[in-house]
Amino acid sequence: MNGYGSPYLYMGGPVSQPRAPLQRTPKCARCRNHGVLSWLKGHKRYCRFKDCTCEKCILIIERQRVMAAQVALRRQQANESLESLIPESLRALPGITVSSGEQSANPRASDIDLRWNTETGTPKTPQDLSDELSGEQSGGENGGSDREPEAVSSPEESKPNLCCTPDTSDPSPQLEESRFGLSKSCSDPEPKSDNPKYSPEPNLLIEGLSGSVSLPFSLRANRPPLEVLKKIFPAHKPAVLELILKGCGGDLVGAIEILLSSRSTMKPEKILSESSDALVLPSNGHLFEHPLSSYPVSSSKWSVGSAFRVPDSLRFSSESSGGVVPGPLSMPLQHGFPQPPRYPLMLRNSLSRGQAGPFMHNDVTLWNTMTLQQQYQLRSQYVPPFSGPSAGVIRSSPLLTSRPSEEHRISIQEESCPVIAKQSMYAADEEYDDRSDSSDSRILNTSS
């Protein structure tokens, strides 16, 4: 009890003290000064000592003046704090210039002062303030018609009177409503004055290769981020923008940075055209005919039907089964490398789900990057034009297997087993010496 009893006994004291004044009935202070107990509610206009000028009653009048001045000061401070908070909450975007805001804030402040003066009337004298306070203390039935102050015995007794009487809470909601109505009326012309100008448009300076994006001023903070992305990037599909926004966790600035960085990486390569159909698979199923046009090579060497176009293993399974390959080659082509490719086809499963549908943005970027690097490898090794024997060697190379073996290789590689796929690239009747030779040595011997 000694270790734990004293804190609980100490904390129990202040809790029991505020409960007692809440249960007492407010009494008239002037009558109490003269030895009479009278209930305060409805008593002000009938008090027999309301015109008394004794020392105790004069002291009560002075206390009422002090309390009325304090109440008026607190109301004014609350009004000023409310005026300073509401315009700051309307400033949502970070890049707004301050010059136009200050010009519109000055008439707004003067309007607030005018409205406050008209609501409160002329400045009151301390006697009027004390009368108003005493009218609030007297109760709802008094009506506040009499201007004579009512006596309160002490500040300790006046505080419970302020808390218990219902009239003290009545003027404050009216003032709050007038303040909110004033703030609404002041905030209404703000978008009207800012929208037709569009001069202080904020700029989001995004670090990236493509520069910055200027957001229009009409995009306020209450707009959903998806609508903002649709207005900034109208060429992108809404489903793509929604997925990018979900990947960023709803962060609008992060989604804009990702879209800008993806656009800046694809601009120098000229992989995707500016139209929206660049993300849709063409009707004939040839995905990589457009990116090959960015290379300044003659069409005779790099035509669609040549031996060095994009291999069929990078195409969809519907195309490989349909046999759409034009040109002199009737069998599907493979790379001339016996080793497994540097970039395995890990995206084939994700792309073959919707075989004729649109691509996702990141898949197309990574897909085209793989294709371009493989084309650079092919160009670096097969730059000299091939004559009849060289083309015949490549066409009759044992690396070019039949279509069932290609399907077997694709299915094995989808199961991420590159070792078996490497062995299936050779024919069954091939010698071990031919297998040990690398593709580079065979190509050099053939070209020489």
From Swiss-Prot:
Biased composition (Polar residues): 98-107, 117-128
Gene from which the chain derives: dmrt3a
InterPro entries: DM_DNA-bd, DM_DNA-bd_sf, DMA, DMRT, UBA-like_sf
Sample GO molecular function, one term: metal ion binding
Alphabetized Gene3D superfamilies for the sequence: DM DNA-binding domain
DNA-binding region: 28-75
Pfam name, any one: DM
Family: Belongs to the DMRT family.
Subcellular location: Nucleus
Domain of life according to the entry: Eukaryota
Protein name per its UniProtKB record: Doublesex- and mab-3-related transcription factor 3a
GO process annotations (BP): male sex differentiation; regulation of transcription by RNA polymerase II
Function according to Swiss-Prot or TrEMBL: Probable transcription factor that plays a role in configuring the spinal circuits controlling motion in vertebrates. Involved in neuronal specification within specific subdivision of spinal cord neurons and in the development of a coordinated locomotor network controlling movements. May regulate transcription.
SMART domains: DM
PANTHER family with a match to the protein in the record: DOUBLESEX AND MAB-3 RELATED TRANSCRIPTION FACTOR DMRT (PTHR12322), DOUBLESEX- AND MAB-3-RELATED TRANSCRIPTION FACTOR 3 (PTHR12322:SF120)
A GO cellular-component term linked to this record: nucleus
Keywords of the record: DNA-binding, Metal-binding, Nucleus, Transcription, Transcription regulation, Zinc
Region ranges (Disordered): 98-203, 424-448
Tissue-specificity statement: Expressed in the developing germ cells of both gonads, mainly in spermatogonia, spermatocytes and developing oocytes. Also expressed in embryonic olfactory placode and neural tube.
